[in-house]
A protein has these predicted regions:
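EAL-family c-di-GMP phosphodiesterase catalytic domain
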Residues: 9, 13-16, 47-51, 61-64, ...
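Short, small-residue-biased leader/transition segments that mark boundaries at the very start
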Residues: 2-4
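A short, well-structured catalytic beta-strand-centered motif of the EAL phosphodiesterase domain
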Residues: 40-76, 95
Length: 267
């Protein structure tokens, strides 16, 4: 009957999805073993001067045939199989080496390097300890590094998290809240933790020219951050019209395909 058929199809779909996730996990493990997980860098620009201000580090998987995949496509697999730490370590190690190379480049202007971390990884503390150790080894000033905390992650023990981040801030590291405005956690984090930067969710930014609602949201999120003394970064800037709107609102920094695609070296 129809119900049995639907149930069979549903189970079949779940089995297929589970097998696909398992295949992705093996692909990712192999990529890590073969050192084919690499950082790409997307430039973040100063809205006032138009000059590069920072680089966001993005994980990419290089397939054996040379095809490049975004690690974002594997996010469910990474979380399910606990591969976040290995991925973060691989990316941080290479990104910090690239930062050291950039610092050694004659005439290179000052810059900041943004690194994405999940709240779970930060709470595990091993990753931040590793980053701190690498900074010391490579003689990278801690204020070059900005750790981005993803808004969608829930933090279990906020008191411990606050103390831990406070200790790192005292050492000079900086923090950004990613995807601001996309959920309840945004405002909870803003109340409980101290951030140097807020990245306004690109889902709002990309529609500000056409949508009065999104334009109003971005303007008011920007104003909120200004009153709190937090610098703003707009994601998903896909046209000059969007950039003009953001400048008019007083957004500090911007990134997106209109300004620059992610590339394998800091431009």
């Amino acid at each position: 009957d129809v119900c049995s058929s639907d149930l069979f199809e549903s189970v079949k779909d779940r089995v297929h999805a589970s097998r696909l996730t398992r295949d992705y996990a093996e692909k990712l493990r192999m990529s890590l073993r073969e050192k084919r997980v690499v950082p790409y860098f997307q430039t973040i620009f100063d809205c006032r001067t138009g000059q590069p201000f920072a680089y966001e580090t993005l994980a990419r998987i290089i397939e054996p045939d040379g095809t490049t995949l975004s690690a974002g496509a594997f996010i469910e697999t990474i979380e399910k199989y606990g591969l976040g730490r290995d991925l973060d370590r691989a990316i941080i190690e290479q990104a910090f080496a690239a930062a050291r190379e950039r610092l050694d480049t004659p005439g290179a202007p000052p810059f900041r390097l943004f690194i994405n971390l999940s709240a779970q990884e930060i709470q595990g503390r091993g990753i931040l300890g590793y980053a701190e150790m690498l900074c010391a080894q490579l003689d990278i000033p801690p204020n070059v590094i900005v750790f981005e905390i993803l808004e969608r992650d829930a933090i279990g023990d906020m008191t411990h998290m606050r103390k831990f981040l406070s200790d790192l801030r005292k050492k000079g590291f900086l923090f950004a809240l990613d995807d601001f405005g996309s959920g309840y956690n945004s405002f909870h984090y803003l109340r409980e933790l101290t951030f140097d930067y807020v990245k306004i969710d690109g889902a709002f930014v990309k529609n500000i020219v056409k949508s009065k609602v999104d334009r109003t949201l971005v303007r008011n999120l920007t104003r909120l951050c200004q009153e709190l003394g937090i610098l703003t970064i707009a994601e998903f800037v896909e046209s000059e019209d969007i950039l003009d709107e953001l400048r008019g609102m007083g957004v500090d920094y911007a990134q997106g395909f209109h300004l620059g695609m992610p590339v394998s070296r800091m431009a």
